[in-house]
Amino acid sequence: MATKKAGGSSKNGRDSAGRRLGLKKSDGQLVNAGNIIVKQRGTKFYPGKNVGLGKDHTIFSLVSGKVKFFRKKKNRVFISVVVDDSTAA
């Protein structure tokens, strides 16, 4: 039996697309209600005032205003949206 088995295809050669995680808005930037500020896996950033936390840990704005990053206890980085009189319509 000098037959040869059919050549199989490689088990490598595929990759998943990137998930587009990270900051979408930076500190001091103006946002509207509903704008996504950060897409993340887990809570690298924590929600502060006037922001919501989605079930996939996305932080989004609840009001229009300016994005503010700050640190609190345990070196946690919090994100808030500060409502300015100039940004309120």
Curated annotation (Swiss-Prot):
One GO MF term attached to the UniProt entry: structural constituent of ribosome
Stretches the record annotates as Disordered: 1-26
GO biological process, one term: translation
SUPFAM superfamilies, sorted: Ribosomal L27 protein-like (SSF110324)
Signal peptide: none
Keyword Ribonucleoprotein: yes
Membrane spanning stretches: none
Keyword Ribonucleoprotein: yes
Keywords: Ribonucleoprotein, Ribosomal protein
A Pfam family recorded for this sequence: Ribosomal_L27
Name of the protein: Large ribosomal subunit protein bL27
InterPro entries linked to this entry: Ribosomal_bL27
Any single Gene Ontology cellular-component annotation: ribonucleoprotein complex
Family per record: Belongs to the bacterial ribosomal protein bL27 family.
